[in-house]
Regions:
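Short, proline-enriched alpha-helix->beta-strand connector loops that line the catalytic pocket
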Residues: 85-91, 110-114
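Serine-dependent carboxylesterase/thioesterase catalytic core
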Residues: 1-85, 101-102
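Short alpha-helix in the alpha/beta-hydrolase fold that links the catalytic acid
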Residues: 102-110
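Generic C-terminal helix-cap and adjacent flexible tail
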Residues: 141-145
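Post-His helix in hydrolase/transferase enzymes
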Residues: 127-140
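Short beta-strand/loop motif that positions the catalytic acidic residue
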Residues: 93-95, 99
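Histidine-bearing beta->alpha loop at or near hydrolase active sites
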Residues: 120-124
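Conserved beta-strand scaffold positions in the cores of enzyme catalytic domains, especially
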Residues: 45, 91-93, 115-117
């Protein structure tokens, strides 16, 4: 993420980027801001269907990424420690009350975030939802003003 953000900033001469991530991608964006030097390069993070506090389904999937998304994993505990987040960066969590992957669905909410709930969409349905697209668009527009 860091290398990609640096290339974008260099090529566009922008001062900051807006990161948008779905599922684990939202956690990666958070980790970049909180632990990998992204605080000075990111304007806001828009997370879609991101298991900020883990998902019970991660126990059924092999691999490092799934292990990190397990409820109570050390990686998530470190990421959520004190739910610290730089106040100058807006974190938006768009989540579905009907997410069939982020279980429990409340795991997508974060105390330091602007939490936006939508209904009737599954985890992958969030990606193809006109409503979610409009929410993301609004967050981008707000972020560049």
């Amino acid at each position: 993420v860091a290398a990609r953000v640096n290339r974008i900033l260099e090529s566009t001469r922008a001062k900051r980027v807006i990161l948008i991530g779905h599922g684990l991608g939202g956690l990666v964006a958070r980790a970049y801001v909180q632990h990998c030097g992204g605080v000075d390069k990111v304007e806001r993070v828009v997370a879609i269907g991101t298991p900020n506090h883990g998902t019970l389904l991660a126990r059924l999937v092999p691999g490092v990424g799934a292990a990190q998304m397990r409820v109570g994993s050390r990686w998530l505990q470190e990421l959520n420690q004190g739910e610290s987040w730089p106040t100058e960066i807006q974190y938006v969590s768009i989540f579905s009350r009907h997410d069939n992957v982020v279980i429990p669905q409340a795991s997508a909410q974060l105390g330091v975030a602007k939490n936006v709930a939508v209904k009737g969409k599954g985890h992958f349905g969030l990606l193809f939802s006109r409503e979610v697209g409009q929410l993301v668009y609004r967050e981008i527009v707000e972020g560049v003003q």
